[in-house]
Amino acid sequence: MMKKNRWFWLVAIIGLGLDQLTKYITVQSFETIGDTFGLWPGVFHLTYVINTGAAFSFFKGGAVWLRWLSLAVSLGLIFLGWYAPRMRIVEQLGYGFILAGALGNGIDRFLFGYVVDFLDFRLINFPVFNLADTFINIGIFFLLLASFPPKSSSQKNTSQ
């Protein structure tokens, strides 16, 4: 069954691994919450923060219901990847990235009650975020691409 939507599973597993690894490295590398390291001072820093809300600290303090939302989304996507007919590659990538992000942040919420964030773009004063947040946005982008119908072979021939 996993062969059917292999890009979905591959992206989800690798993405989840990268997300959890980078969060672990962040926690082990910084002594206290709020510590920062400027990779490109004033532009991009690694900053250790915890987030009890959703992406960009929306719904701050909503960890209880957010953990269940993460679980529901994750289970729904696992069900989709396992039982749905073979998806187009762009759909597999989209759903796989979203699953990686939902699982990554969901694991944190269930284990710790918060999510570890560390990617800090200061040039544009953007909220600190993590790879799971990035993966969810990449997944949405792929699903938006997938929403455009593929060109049929007759359309391809007439546009040349």
Curated annotation (Swiss-Prot):
Keywords, ordered alphabetically: Aspartyl protease, Cell inner membrane, Cell membrane, Hydrolase, Membrane, Protease, Transmembrane, Transmembrane helix
Entry's transmembrane regions: 7-27, 39-59, 62-82, 96-116, 126-146
GO cellular component, one term: plasma membrane
EC number: 3.4.23.36
Location (main, coarse): membrane
Intracellular or extracellular location(s): Cell inner membrane
Protein name (database record): Lipoprotein signal peptidase
